[in-house]
Amino acid sequence: MLVLGLETSCDETGVALYDSERGLLADALFSQIDLHRVFGGVVPELASRDHVKRMLPLIRQVLDEAGCVATEIDAIAYTAGPGLVGALLVGASCAQALAFAWDIPAIGVHHMEGHLLAPMLEENPPAFPFVALLVSGGHTQLVRVDGIGQYELLGESLDDAAGEAFDKTAKLIGLNYPGGPEIARLAEQGVAGRFVFPRPMTDRPGLEFSFSGLKTFALNTWQQCKNAGDDSEQTRCDLSLAFQQAVVETLTIKCKRALKQTGLKRLVIAGGVSANKALRASLEDMLGSIKGNVYYARPQFCTDNGAMIAYAGCQRLLAGQQQDLAISVQARWPMEQLPPL
């Protein structure tokens, strides 16, 4: 089955072609970072308009790269949520229009299920069951995964997601958008031990997260430095390192608890923050200490992309899941509501 995947949940237009027998054939992405950087964050209306501009050229591009023609496509998968409604509607409308014109099925895919399954595109995919850490700009969740659509939420953030905390903290200390990669870059030059951040909610049982306090702690620390006349680049580096260490250690502690609670030794990390090198190294060390394994996608498939949507949609289509031509998207969509395969 040859599936065209469309991703438009936020500020990246992703298109890919995935074949159930041959694997990923082509993948293309246009990032709107430069468009939104001047505003310090994503402007939904601008995001939607740019998706409209980019979608069809990217579809033509992946068809050319794969050496395919439209008549060879068996189905279309598109992101139906969660995400920005306007942006989602662009992808959904395009998918359903093409599906109608080509007389093929289209299926809406859950954005975070796409992220969760992205490591399946790698040479050494994880076997079920496993624990998944979904960590992005909008989500921080620990999920037990027994199969596609078989999800048990173990814990999640009670306020800011980890990626959101990265971006907001970066903005508070004067870094460019997107803030997560900027903090990671500066942290490499930071001096450890100068600042010590708390590890929120690690001193109590449970698998919930809270990152809003770290953002406030960073703001107060930065203001104290500025008031003392020390707002140097090195101070930003040291602050970035301390913040990153706090987030990474907090996530690692919670992941270890989740593995112990479930009795599992396989961990998948997915979502934009899973590309963070410090987080990967910390989780690899932790899994090594318990003789377990950690799995993640290559960096280009950690951020939003069409390949993960094409793959996830393909699995559901092969299992016989169907959908009518109604255009329906959801800004919020609990992953536990998805039907199991």
Curated annotation (Swiss-Prot):
Keywords in alphabetical order, please: Acyltransferase, Cytoplasm, Iron, Metal-binding, Transferase, tRNA processing
| Residue numbers binding Fe cation | H111, H115, D304
What Pfam families does the database record attribute to this sequence? TsaD
Supply the InterPro entries for this chain. Answer: ATPase_NBD, Gcp-like_dom, KAE1/TsaD, TsaD
Cofactor binding, per record: Binds 1 Fe(2+) ion per subunit.
Listed binding positions for substrate are L134, V135, S136, G137, G138, D167, G180, N276
Q: Does the keyword Membrane apply?
A: no
- Protein name from the UniProt record: tRNA N6-adenosine threonylcarbamoyltransferase
Q: Which organism is it from?
A: Pseudomonas putida (strain ATCC 700007 / DSM 6899 / JCM 31910 / BCRC 17059 / LMG 24140 / F1)
Which gene is annotated as encoding this protein in its UniProt record?
A: tsaD
